[in-house]
Amino acid sequence: MPTLRLPDGVLSAAVSRSVVSEYRERYSLLDIDQRVAHALTMEVMLTPKPGLVDRANNGSHRDMDVALFQTSIQAISPWFRHFTDAGYQHASVPLAQLLSQVRPIGIACEQAMLSATKGVNTHKGGIFAFGLLCTAAGWLTARGERVTQRSLCDSVAAMCHDLVRNELETCSGAATAGEHLYLRHGLTGARGEAASGFNTVCQHALPALQQAIAAGMDDETALLQTLLVLMAHNPDTNVVSRGGMDGLAFVQDYAQRLLAGPLDRQALIKMDEALIARNLSPGGSADLLALTWLLYHYPTE
């Protein structure tokens, strides 16, 4: 049974499945903004993370550190309540039409981030993914449907069904980094992951996290293991934008090698050094790790 981490970050004592279920159902909306903030904080504080900002170093980044991430999280966290409220208020709108209703909230949330960080993009991917999940949670709750891992991810998939076609397949030029990578490599990035209902998370990361914790790993070790699983399977456009497809192959192969044995923190530190030397940052996998941690605390079905 997953242990339950309360919004204030204090790990509760073991409780029965029925109590966990009641907690999750009762507070699925009331504290979702706190849950998102906790997941984002967990991700940045987790150490060591190859190529990423953590408590040991700034990874392959020269313009951000843990303190800046914390400032960013504080700035964007209140906006996730607005996503949830929008989903709740538009419960009569089909999911396929819901994305346009929350785009202005996403833009405002990004502006809050950029204002707080003085122009540094710390959480654009997180805003996109968590904004969609919060919107879905509000929509499901207003319709009297259960908020579960499956219902959240299925709802996001329905919301983003046409996203790749509308924003990538029809683009005439590479106006954004995502469009450039799609035109050059066929990578759909965060849009494709959302349109798939976060398939990489559901098929790889969540099972890995659940198995690791069931095997007795502490949260930090289980999350580091899960991060490696994500790095091994995620076609991370953050990596490709810095190192091309060769860079992606390097990260994926390295992660697969480490997964072949028990988790070794010294090996993670060496991987960190290797990614920094190549200026590679698996930021997409970091976003998906935070997403995995949030989803883990909801019932599966």
Curated annotation (Swiss-Prot):
InterPro entries to which the protein is assigned, alphabetical: CitG, TriPribosyl-deP-CoA_syn_CitG
Keyword Hydrolase: no
A GO biological process held by the record: prosthetic group biosynthetic process
ATP-binding recorded as keyword: yes
Transmembrane intervals: none
Annotated family: Belongs to the CitG/MdcB family.
PANTHER family associated with the record: 2-(5''-TRIPHOSPHORIBOSYL)-3'-DEPHOSPHOCOENZYME-A SYNTHASE, TRIPHOSPHORIBOSYL-DEPHOSPHO-COA SYNTHASE
Protein name (record): 2-(5''-triphosphoribosyl)-3'-dephosphocoenzyme-A synthase
